[in-house]
Amino acid sequence: MDIILGVVMFTLIVLALVLVILFAKSKLVPTGDITISINGDADKSIVTSPGGKLLSALAGAGVFVSSACGGGGSCGQCRVKVKSGGGDILPTELDHITKGEAREGERLACQVAVKTDMDIELPEEIFGVKKWECTVISNDNKATFIKELKLQIPDGESVPFRAGGYIQIEAPAHHVKYADFDVPEEYRGDWDKFNLFRYESIVKEDIIRAYSMANYPEEFGIIMLNVRIATPPPNNPDVAPGQMSSYIWSLKEGDKCTISGPFGEFFAKDTDAEMVFIGGGAGMAPMRSHIFDQLKRLKSKRKMSYWYGARSKREMFYVEDFDGLAAENDNFVWHCALSDPLPEDNWDGYTGFIHNVLYENYLRDHDAPEDCEYYMCGPPMMNAAVIGMLKNLGVEDENILLDDFGG
């Protein structure tokens, strides 16, 4: 009898605990549909299930907020204003949002949990963002570690972007072997030297990254990107290679690729001020877009120059394009500086780092460098060096425009 009584008591205790858990769940875990009101416009409101993050809920309803890191909380781009229902701001958001901005409701959509009805504000241009499945036209090396990915937009479609804008590219889970990359013989020296073909990239979930466009708006029907492969650094070869760059480098003619956009804020100012463009590495992309747009579409007569830094002649690309623009436009000149020219380059042009070359050969003797507008995109060290040099010349922040996606 004691055994039976013990079993009964144990069963009753378990049932009681289950009831407590179910009751707590009903109070703590949201059920039913969640309504997200957007910009006070009933037509823009979306209804979704609770759980997940605001960024995903918006994307599921066809509202694509920029997120270069794919929702990891590291890029700080997916900023929205949450007027109610977002809960407390998280420590991960405070790396990108000031306390003052937080008081105004600024949040990162990728960090906001969807638990209850919400009221948010989004920029109106977000509603012009679309998604396309594109076809790879070509994916060719332009330098040792840079490919030009050219995508065909579906027939009848267009991407209404501005020069300096960017798109987001999606990659499914994948397993990429560097040994399968198509790298022309002229670029294989460093690949063999650093044994780069041994690497593989294994990604077990969908990812999203942002890339600036190299084409300009009147190159219709295509999207063109300059993508630098993110290989592990030589001093830490066991680090995993870049996920998205590895995927992009694996793409072949005819492959399908999903993009969304357009996004952007790295746009040219509508003034008559002199424009100075500074680029390096894959930072070529928005520079090409801007310069082509100014000279070919806008027929701009603004004085402009382009200063590009590369290691050697092998790393220079679009040379004929810029030579042609310089020949056709008296208001445009361009210069390339090589930091490590090879003997076979027979280089008689500028040498050294591009910020020093720009200063020594142009800005040092410029009548008013502080009055120019500076547009730059390149590796972080280049960007920092250029900004430091410009600050020393008295250039205000408003005249220094930086695209962080290049390089």
UniProtKB/Swiss-Prot annotation:
The GO terms this record gives for MF are: 2 iron, 2 sulfur cluster binding; electron transfer activity; metal ion binding; oxidoreductase activity, acting on NAD(P)H, quinone or similar compound as acceptor
Its protein name is: Na(+)-translocating NADH-quinone reductase subunit F
Which InterPro entries does the entry link to? 2Fe-2S_ferredoxin-like_sf (IPR036010), 2Fe-2S_ferredoxin-type (IPR001041), Beta-grasp_dom_sf (IPR012675), Cbr1-like_FAD-bd_dom (IPR008333), FAD-bd_FR_type (IPR017927), FNR_nucleotide-bd (IPR039261), NqrF (IPR010205), OxRdtase_FAD/NAD-bd (IPR001433)
The UniProt entry, under PROSITE patterns, shows:
2FE2S_FER_2, FAD_FR
What processes does the entry annotate via GO biological process terms? sodium ion transport
**Which reactions appear under catalytic activity for this entry?**
a ubiquinone + n Na(+)(in) + NADH + H(+) = a ubiquinol + n Na(+)(out) + NAD(+)
Q: Which residues cross the membrane?
A: 3-23
Question: Which positions bind [2Fe-2S] cluster?
Answer: C69, C75, C78, C110
Residue ranges of domain 2Fe-2S ferredoxin-type in the record: 32-126
Give UniProt keywords alphabetically: 2Fe-2S, Cell inner membrane, Cell membrane, FAD, Flavoprotein, Ion transport, Iron, Iron-sulfur, Membrane, Metal-binding, NAD, Sodium, Sodium transport, Translocase, Transmembrane, Transmembrane helix, Transport, Ubiquinone
Q: Return any one Pfam family short name.
A: FAD_binding_6
Quaternary structure annotation from Swiss-Prot or TrEMBL:
Composed of six subunits; NqrA, NqrB, NqrC, NqrD, NqrE and NqrF.
Q: What is its EC number?
A: 7.2.1.1
What does it do? Answer: NQR complex catalyzes the reduction of ubiquinone-1 to ubiquinol by two successive reactions, coupled with the transport of Na(+) ions from the cytoplasm to the periplasm. The first step is catalyzed by NqrF, which accepts electrons from NADH and reduces ubiquinone-1 to ubisemiquinone by a one-electron transfer pathway.
Membrane topology note: Single-pass membrane protein
Kindly list the cofactors needed: [2Fe-2S] cluster; FAD
Give me the ranges of the annotated region Catalytic.
272-389
- Enumerate the subcellular locations listed in this protein's record, separating them with semicolons: Cell inner membrane
Give the record's GO CC terms: plasma membrane
The cofactor binding remark recorded in the entry reads: Binds 1 [2Fe-2S] cluster.
Family to which the UniProt record says this protein belongs: Belongs to the NqrF family.
Q: Which organism is it from?
A: Vibrio vulnificus (strain YJ016)
